[in-house]
Amino acid sequence: MLDLNLDVDSTESTQNERDSITVKGVSLNQMDESVTSNSSVVNAEASSCIDGEDELCSTRTVKFQFEILKGGGEEEEEDDDERSAVMMTKEFFPVAKGMNFMDSSAQSSRSTVDISFQRGKQGGDFIGSGSGGGDASRVMQPPSQPVKKSRRGPRSKSSQYRGVTFYRRTGRWESHIWDCGKQVYLGGFDTAHAAARAYDRAAVKFRGLEADINFVIGDYEEDLKQMANLSKEEVVQVLRRQSSGFSRNNSRYQGVALQKIGGWGAQMEQLHGNMGCDKAAVQWKGREAASLIEPHASRMIPEAANVKLDLNLGISLSLGDGPKQKDRALRLHHVPNNSVCGRNTMMENHMAAAACDTPFNFLKRGSDHLNNRHALPSAFFSPMERTPEKGLMLRSHQSFPARTWQGHDQSSGGTAVAATAPPLFSNAASSGFSLSATRPPSSTAIHHPSQPFVNLNQPGLYVIHPSDYISQHQHNLMNRPQPPP
C-alpha cells in the first residue's frame, strides 16, 4: 500500500535544524523533479517571525512531499532545499477567513506555520495573510455595480444605433419601433444617423422622456414642442414623409399615398377628394378636364369662382346671305338666370357645373328641357312668339353677335324656326355639338321683330324644347351633331 502521509519540512538557513510535521491530506510533491508542478509555485519572500524571534529567523521554506516518492538520498534533498530557499507553495484547499492550517491555540511551538493565504488582487500581486498580518493585510474589493439592463432589448446587430437596421436588398437604413407588441415602420433613410434620429423622436413620443434613445434628450427640444399636439399616428406619418424611400407606399407629402392601381392618390373622403381633383383639373386643363363628381348645386366648388371658362355653345344655321333674309331676323338677348332657377336638368359636359349665381352655367339640350315654354315670363316674348307656332328660342349673352331666327312652313302644317349666327367659339367638351351646323335655306320665312330684353351679367345659353307641331324628324335633325365644314 502507498503511504499518503504528507510531511511538512521547515528549513531555516541560519539554524540547520528541521522540524517535521506530519499532516494528513492529499497533495503532490511540488519540489520533486518527477512530479513538479510549476503552475502552483509563486515566487515570494516569506518573512514570518514567530513569537518575536526576528533575530533568529530569516527565510523559511515550506515543502509538501510524499514519503514514497522520495528516492534520491540526502544529496538530492539538500539540493532541493537550496533551490527552494525563496519559494512558497500555494495551498490547494485554503482555510476560510484566514484561519491557521493548524490550530494555533492548541500548539504554541514555533514550528507551527500558517500556510493559508488570501489572494487579493491589488496591483496584480498576491498578498499572503501570514501569521501576524490578520485582517489588516486583506484588501477588500468594492462590490461592482450591476450593469443596467435595457428595457427595450439589445441593440441592432447591423447598426450601432438602437432601432436601426440595414437592408441589403434596398440599400437603406430602416427604422422601426415596438409599440403594444407590434413593430411600427418609421421609414427608410440613406444614413444610419438619420434613421437613428427618427427612432429617437418616435421613442420620445411613444415612451416619454425616460425612453432609451441613441442621443441626448436635449437635441429634441424643438421636436417635443411640435409633437405636443400630435398623436402617435401623425408622428409616424411625419417621420415616414421625411424618409428617402417609398417602400411602404407612403409619400413625402401629407395625405398622398400610392394606390393599388399604381397611381398616387389623396387619402381623404371620396367627395372632398374628388372635389379637390376637379378643382385642380379645371384650373390646369380647362374645359377638356374630366370630372369625378355629379354636376349638382350642393357640390359646387366655390374656390373656382375666379376660373374663367368659355362654356357657351354656338349653333350656326346658314339661311343665306341675302339682305331680305337678314332683315327678317329676330335678335334675342340674355334671359335672366333667375327665371329658370329650380329646374331639374342634366348635362352631358361633366365639367360644366350648373347652379344659379355660380361661375358655371347649365348646358341644356332640347330633350333635357321642359316642354312648357310658358315657364319664362311673358314679357320676354313678342306677340308673335306667344303663338302656339313658336318652336325654339335661343338665349345668348349680349357680348356675342346677335342670333337670327327664321321660320318656314313644313308639309305637316307646323312651323319650324331656324337660327343663323356667325361661328362662335369651340364647343364645350362632350357637349355633342360641333363648331357649326348647316341648314338649307327655306323659301318662306316669318319675320319676328327684334325686342330689347333685360341684360344681366351672367352669361348662359338655353335651348327650349320645340313645340308639339314640329315633327320628331325635324327635332332630331336640329340636335344631331354635324362635322365641321
Curated annotation (Swiss-Prot):
- Please state which protein family the record places this protein in: Belongs to the AP2/ERF transcription factor family. AP2 subfamily.
Q: Which Pfam families match?
A: AP2
> According to the UniProt record, which residues make up the DNA-binding region?
160-216
Q: Where is this region: Disordered?
A: 124-161
- Supply the induction statement: Repressed by miR172a-2/EAT.
Q: What is its main location?
A: nucleus
Where found?
Answer: Nucleus
This protein's superkingdom? Eukaryota
Q: What is this protein called?
A: AP2-like ethylene-responsive transcription factor TOE2
- Spell out the Gly residues composition-biased ranges: 124-135
Q: Which UniProt keywords apply?
A: Activator, DNA-binding, Ethylene signaling pathway, Nucleus, Transcription, Transcription regulation
- Show the GO cellular component annotation of the record: nucleus
The taxonomy runs:
Eukaryota, Viridiplantae, Streptophyta, Embryophyta, Tracheophyta
Q: Which InterPro entries match?
A: AP2/ERF_dom, AP2/ERF_dom_sf, DNA-bd_dom_sf
Query: Organism, per UniProt?
Result: Arabidopsis thaliana
Q: What does this protein do?
A: Probably acts as a transcriptional activator. Binds to the GCC-box pathogenesis-related promoter element. May be involved in the regulation of gene expression by stress factors and by components of stress signal transduction pathways. Regulates negatively the transition to flowering time and confers flowering time delay.
Which PANTHER family does the protein's record reference?
AP2-LIKE ETHYLENE-RESPONSIVE TRANSCRIPTION FACTOR, AP2-LIKE ETHYLENE-RESPONSIVE TRANSCRIPTION FACTOR TOE2
Record keyword DNA-binding present: yes
